[in-house]
């Protein structure tokens, strides 16, 4: 038949947060992962082989089109498993490095001063070729990475001071 089944929800969703301390230093890490789900990558569908017309599409994707399974992928956008990819990923969401100084020896108005820096959206480890494997997994269009839904996820840098009175 012409039915297509997408595993749009991960089999496993997990996260790990930990803080390591050594003397006055602390290092925190926040990671999470989704494993075992499919993403329909619409980028190549709209911008790749189907986005071209005529002979140009055959030159770009010739090896893939030699397979009879994909002989009819051209022209009008067609949803098919050709654009289905494993969306499993591991994201390092944040890493924080801090240093705490005991102030009670020097002043009566504060006990401790902590200076820290955080990097957000550190890395995404995935085999997915699209923009971001973390797509909507609920509703009618779960598991679809849409071309028009492509706001970049920025890396952030934060510096902070924490005072304990």
Protein language model features and the residues they cover:
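Membrane-embedded beta-strand positions of outer-membrane beta-barrel proteins
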Residues: 29, 115-117, 161
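C-terminal beta-signal and terminal closure region of outer-membrane beta-barrel proteins
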Residues: 77-79, 124-165
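Residues that define the transmembrane beta-barrel architecture of outer-membrane proteins
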Residues: 10-14, 88-93, 111, 153-157
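Repeated loop/turn-to-beta-strand initiation elements of outer-membrane beta-barrel proteins
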Residues: 24-28, 104
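Extracytoplasmic gating/loop element in the C-terminal half of outer-membrane beta-barrel translocons
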Residues: 34-121
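Short, small-residue-biased leader/transition segments that mark boundaries at the very start
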Residues: 1-6
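Outer-membrane beta-barrel domain signature
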Residues: 7, 84-86, 146-150
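Long hydrophobic segments that form regular secondary structure
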Residues: 17-25
